[in-house]
C-alpha cells in the first residue's frame, strides 16, 4: 500500500517550489494530496476594487497552472480554499485548523509537509 503525503501550501506554486523534487522522486511510491490555503494573487494589487476582474482572472490562471504542473506528477487530489493572499494571519486560527483537521481525517496521511517555520512570508508562517 502506498504511503499518503499531505502537502499544505500557502499558495499555488509553493508546492512545486518546495516539493517538486520530492514529487518527482516519489511520484510512483506515494499518493499525494495538496491543500492551497490562499489564492496567491490578490496581494499583488493595492486597489483590489479597481482590479477585481483582473484579480479573479489571475486567481483562475494560477489555479490552472497549478493543476497543469501537478498533473505532470499524476497528482490530482487537490483542494483550493481561496483565502485572501497575504491575509492568512487574519483568518481565525480555528478556521484554518478545522480545514487542516478535516483534510487529515479524510485523507489519513502518513507524512505531512508544509512551509518552514523560518519562512518570512506571513501566509507561509500562518
Task: Cite the ranges covered by each PLM segment.
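Active-site rim/loop-helix segments in enzyme catalytic domains that contact anionic ligands
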Residues: 1-107
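Active-site adenylate/phosphate-handling loop in enzymes that bind or generate adenylated species
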Residues: 99-126
Amino acid at each position: 500500500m502506498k504511503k499518503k503525503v499531505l502537502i499544505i501550501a500557502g499558495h499555488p506554486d509553493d508546492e512545486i517550489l518546495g516539493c517538486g523534487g520530492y514529487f518527482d522522486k516519489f511520484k510512483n511510491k506515494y499518493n499525494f494530496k495538496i491543500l492551497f490555503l490562499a489564492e496567491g494573487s490578490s496581494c499583488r494589487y493595492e486597489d483590489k476594487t479597481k482590479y477585481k476582474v483582473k484579480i479573479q482572472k489571475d486567481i483562475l490562471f494560477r489555479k490552472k497552472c497549478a493543476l497543469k504542473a501537478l498533473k505532470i506528477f499524476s497528482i490530482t487530489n487537490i483542494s483550493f480554499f481561496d483565502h485572501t493572499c497575504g491575509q492568512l494571519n487574519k483568518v481565525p486560527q480555528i478556521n484554518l485548523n478545522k480545514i487542516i483537521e478535516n483534510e487529515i481525517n479524510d485523507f489519513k496521511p502518513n507524512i505531512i509537509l508544509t512551509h518552514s517555520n523560518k519562512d518570512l512570508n506571513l501566509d507561509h508562517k500562518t
